[in-house]
């Protein structure tokens, strides 16, 4: 009769050697077994290594001064805003550095940032440059396209999808990225009094943004659009995502002025009408944002508020010429590819800046002004071998004269005669 051999029949964990009677569970693989105790141990090791990897990503975190230096390469002026952003971003990623498997006595909370300033003052460029400096995923969203759940428009989760896409669907990277939400002032409540009518693009959106600003595990539809039953979702933790909220907040200077009792600090009372809007923004307080239409809970999620100044002629001229990717440098390089030298006179730069101020477009409108003046030249030059140099004057910018064209010997060239 066949005799049962217990020693041969008992299954053992291939890692620790314990048999099936000594553990709660054995999981079978291809010729191997692993017990529940080894599974738990492996899980702990993986979690610790992942946490260590997350902190190592920012071991070379630049200091606030180094961040400021990088911002100076691309953004002219706005020193106060750049300093506030540099410190805020440094503290944010330093906070991520200290996160790990061990519990800390003091929990450092996230500090999102609000940038308040007129159109074309550099809000978006600041956020973009920060992300580039830190080499983290970056996404831009427009608050005006958002509506609260259940209404036509974008859900707030679609903002997170853009960040996930920017990180090539690497969730770990996305969870340490930066999201810039523009036009945040456009979702302000229409008045301080709660209305009985629905404000689906105002207070409702603020309420929807609250959780992702503070930190939550959000369910994001991988294809975007509205959520629906039986749909698969991407899970992303927003706790370590830095949100930078930007807006022009037109008219908030009047709100501040009313709070200050029609008297601007640092100015004589009879000069109240001649106040500097930028000086007023320096005195902005949370109650001003609430009076403008942001709900208190939303304001509480953006403890850092930096104001950007209106750009004057001198600042706009510097923007045209000084940054690494300055517009004048770009257009010079563009014509250089056609073996043509491009020159802007000092008066031309002043005229460009003046026109941008007149149009109230700030730095954002500089490119279109230059493009208007160069479009004909950029059309003709590739077909002409005579032009070696183009000079743009203030008369060119003001549409009073054509650009001055010269050949290699310095003689003036008339393209109309040449083509004839």
From Swiss-Prot:
**GO MF term (any one):** ATP hydrolysis activity
Please name one Pfam family that this protein belongs to: zf-C4_ClpX
Domain ClpX-type ZB: where? 1-54
Tagged with keyword Magnesium: no
GO cellular component entries: HslUV protease complex
UniProt keywords (A-Z) are: ATP-binding, Chaperone, Metal-binding, Nucleotide-binding, Zinc
GO biological process, any: cell division
Segments traversing the membrane: none
Sites binding Zn(2+) sit at 13, 16, 35, 38
Keyword Nucleotide-binding in the entry? The reply is: yes
Q: Which residues bind ATP?
A: 118-125
Q: Which InterPro entries match?
A: AAA+_ATPase, ATP-dep_Clp_protease_ClpX, ATPase_AAA_core, Clp_ATPase_C, Clp_protease_ATP-bd_su_ClpX, ClpX_bact, P-loop_NTPase, Znf_CppX_C4
- NCBIfam families attached to this UniProt entry: clpX, PRK05342.1
Return the similarity comment.
Answer: Belongs to the ClpX chaperone family.
Q: List the PANTHER family hit by this protein, alphabetically.
A: ATP-DEPENDENT CLP PROTEASE ATP-BINDING SUBUNIT CLPX-LIKE, MITOCHONDRIAL (PTHR48102:SF7), ATP-DEPENDENT CLP PROTEASE ATP-BINDING SUBUNIT CLPX-LIKE, MITOCHONDRIAL-RELATED (PTHR48102)
Please describe what this protein does: ATP-dependent specificity component of the Clp protease. It directs the protease to specific substrates. Can perform chaperone functions in the absence of ClpP.
Q: Which HAMAP family match?
A: ClpX
Record's subunit section:
Component of the ClpX-ClpP complex. Forms a hexameric ring that, in the presence of ATP, binds to fourteen ClpP subunits assembled into a disk-like structure with a central cavity, resembling the structure of eukaryotic proteasomes.
What this protein is called in its record is ATP-dependent Clp protease ATP-binding subunit ClpX
Q: What is the lineage of its organism?
A: Bacteria, Bacillati, Bacillota, Bacilli, Bacillales
């Amino acid at each position: 009769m066949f005799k049962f051999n217990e020693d041969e029949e008992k299954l053992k964990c291939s890692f620790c050697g314990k048999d099936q009677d000594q553990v709660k569970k054995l999981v079978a693989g291809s010729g191997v077994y692993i017990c529940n105790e080894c599974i738990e141990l492996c899980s702990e090791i993986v979690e610790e290594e992942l946490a260590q990897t997350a902190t190592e990503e920012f071991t070379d975190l630049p200091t606030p001064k180094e961040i400021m230096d990088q911002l100076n390469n691309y953004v002219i002026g706005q020193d106060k805003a750049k300093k506030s952003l540099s410190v805020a971003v440094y503290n944010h990623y330093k906070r991520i550095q200290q996160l790990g498997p061990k519990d800390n006595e003091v929990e450092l909370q996230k500090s999102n940032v609000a940038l308040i300033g007129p159109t074309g003052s550099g809000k978006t460029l600041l956020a973009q440059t920060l992300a580039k400096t830190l080499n983290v995923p970056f996404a831009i969203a427009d608050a005006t396209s958002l509506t609260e759940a259940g209404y036509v428009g974008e859900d707030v989760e679609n903002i997170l999808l853009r960040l996930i896409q920017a990180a090539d669907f690497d969730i770990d990277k996305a969870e340490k990225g930066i999201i810039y939400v523009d036009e945040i002032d456009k979702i302000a409540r229409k008045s301080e009094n709660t209305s009985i009518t629905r404000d689906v693009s105002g207070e409702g959106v603020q309420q929807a943004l609250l959780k992702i600003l503070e930190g939550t595990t959000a369910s994001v539809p991988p294809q975007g659009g509205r959520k629906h039953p039986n749909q698969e979702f991407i899970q992303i933790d927003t706790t370590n995502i830095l949100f930078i909220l930007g807006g022009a907040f037109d008219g908030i200077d009047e709100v501040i002025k009313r709070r200050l009792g029609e008297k601007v600090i640092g100015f004589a009372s009879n000069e109240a009408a001649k106040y500097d809007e930028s000086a007023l923004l320096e005195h902005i307080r949370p109650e001003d944002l609430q009076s403008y239409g942001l709900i208190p809970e939303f304001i509480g999620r953006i403890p850092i508020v930096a104001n950007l100044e209106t750009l004057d002629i001198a600042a706009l001229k510097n923007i045209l010429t000084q940054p690494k990717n300055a517009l004048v440098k770009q257009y010079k390089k563009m014509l250089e590819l056609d073996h043509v030298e491009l020159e802007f006179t000092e008066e031309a730069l002043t005229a460009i800046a003046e026109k941008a101020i007149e149009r109230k477009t700030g730095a954002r409108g500089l490119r279109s002004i230059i493009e208007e003046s160069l479009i004909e030249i950029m059309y003709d030059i590739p077909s002409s071998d005579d032009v070696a140099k183009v000079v743009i004057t203030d008369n060119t910018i003001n549409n009073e004269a054509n650009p001055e064209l010269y050949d290699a010997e310095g003689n003036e060239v008339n393209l109309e005669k040449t083509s004839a």
